[in-house]
Curated annotation (Swiss-Prot):
Gene name of the encoded protein: gdhA-2
SUPFAM superfamilies: Aminoacid dehydrogenase-like, N-terminal domain (SSF53223), NAD(P)-binding Rossmann-fold domains (SSF51735)
Cleavable signal peptide: none
Post-translational modification: Methylation of lysine residues may play a role in the thermal stability of this enzyme.
GO biological process terms on file: glutamate catabolic process
Active site: K109
Organism of derivation: Saccharolobus solfataricus (strain ATCC 35092 / DSM 1617 / JCM 11322 / P2)
In-chain residues carrying the UniProt-annotated modification N6-methyllysine: K254, K260, K372, K391, K392
Subunit and partners: Homohexamer.
Protein's UniProt name: Glutamate dehydrogenase 2
Keywords (A to Z) from UniProt: Acetylation, Methylation, NAD, NADP, Oxidoreductase
Top EC class for this record: oxidoreductase
Gene Ontology molecular function terms on file: glutamate dehydrogenase (NAD+) activity; glutamate dehydrogenase (NADP+) activity
Family annotation (PANTHER family): GLUTAMATE DEHYDROGENASE, GLUTAMATE DEHYDROGENASE 1, MITOCHONDRIAL
Similarity annotation: Belongs to the Glu/Leu/Phe/Val dehydrogenases family.
Amino acid sequence: MMEEVLSSSLYTQQVKKLYKVGELLGLDNETLETLSQPERIIQVKIQIRGSDGKLKTFMGWRSQHNSALGPYKGGVRYHPNVTQDEVEALSMIMTWKNSLLLLPYGGGKGGVRVDPKKLTREELEQLSRKYIQAIYKYLGSELDIPAPDVNTDSQTMAWFLDEYIKITGKVDFAVFTGKPVELGGIGVRLYSTGLGVATIAKEAANKFIGGVEEARVIIQGFGNVGYYAGKFLSEMGAKIVGVSDSKGGVINEKGIDVGKAIEIKEKTGSVINYPEGRKVTNEELLISDCDILIPAALENVINKFNAPKVKAKLIVEGANGPLTADADEIMRQRGIAVVPDILANAGGVVGSYVEWANNKMGEIISDEEAKKLIVDRMNNAFNTLYDYHQKKLEDHDLRTAAMALAVDRVVRAMKARGIL
């Protein structure tokens, strides 16, 4: 039983992907072994005094996977299911994501095993400060730069920053990204992931389906990423014909006003109450007729059972891992292009880079300038990947090509530095 759990763990899945790509790149086992292990894993015990006076204990981690291309970069999540395995796997994914986007970073990830809904604001602040007290020696604007992730936000980063300054005496705002604007954050960080998804969808549409103008788009998941992806795609001339959230969705061939849809979601709790169109389940939405499908909610929603029924001509992964390996293979056989999450949802970390770079230079950037930098970086990354795929790995899918390009860059950097 334990072997089954281990074999299906996120970390094991990532190592398998690495070895598969390593074979294509002709990497030896020694190199792959080095790449599969984090350079450092920090495990900490965090104890806080609850508002009821009782001591509460939580486990936390920070995984620093690889620093060949620069300081570690990646979010910190608060979730009851956080494990060391998950944090290590996510830090590895961040290494490849940062490499693919040509960002001057390695990969890192942090997490605390906690249900934040069960803590008061005061307890959350205490937890956040204690986490930094435990790991501050391993952080720095040129060492490891955390950011928000699941259940953490700009307020969490503000607590992190304040605690870091108190302990170290260094007033260095670039140690954390995703901060409030008052503390050197940038406004576009709010929508940078959705902007990135829309930008990639437009570029991919130009290459695979003849452009984004009038393209019919379905978005599964109407949270921050889904909403902003829809908003920007609408502005680019696409027609949003379907949206959904956890309660279900709506299809309207004439087009959905995303501004109106988000208002209805905020007022009633779900986009399923959008008045014009027909109500559908999430399962029905994924196999509805469209040109571009953007799964922006949960992982593994497109699998071997529904992949043969998907009618989209192009899939852009807004969520992390929305397609299973079986679904990937089915899409490849059907000739449906899939732009992988490692690129499609990387707008968030590009936004973080813009914030970090401006903090380092002591500059204040306008939202328009920041937006342009994110769009340009995403466009360049997509076109570089597309060319690499066409020239070197045309027989494989875009996901394999993205991983190969990212791993190759890290290996070259490690060789140049004499690590390998």
